[in-house]
Amino acid sequence: MQNKETLEQRIAELEMKTTFQEKLLDELNQVIVEQQFAIDKIHVQLRYLVNKFKDMQPSNIASQAEETPPPHY
């Protein structure tokens, strides 16, 4: 009888551990989903800022109106 009770106790402990691990896995998965949403949002914001920064930088190529006319012969 001792052996049967020990086995039942071990099975109960394993079931508890499995239940705890399943719950923890679900919670960790939810954290990963939330982090991915945050990363996606930051990525969009970064792309916007990069484009905004590019628009602010002066171009090294002068526009036609700013070019000095070529010398005439």
Curated annotation (Swiss-Prot):
**Hey, which family's this protein in?**
Belongs to the SlyX family.
User: What PANTHER family does this protein's entry cite?
Assistant: PROTEIN SLYX
What organism does the record attribute this protein to?
Pasteurella multocida (strain Pm70)
Q: What is this protein called?
A: Protein SlyX homolog
Superkingdom as given in the UniProt entry:
Bacteria
User: Which lineage?
Assistant: Bacteria, Pseudomonadati, Pseudomonadota, Gammaproteobacteria, Pasteurellales
Q: What InterPro entries does the entry give?
A: SlyX
Instruction: Provide the coiled-coil residue spans.
Output: none
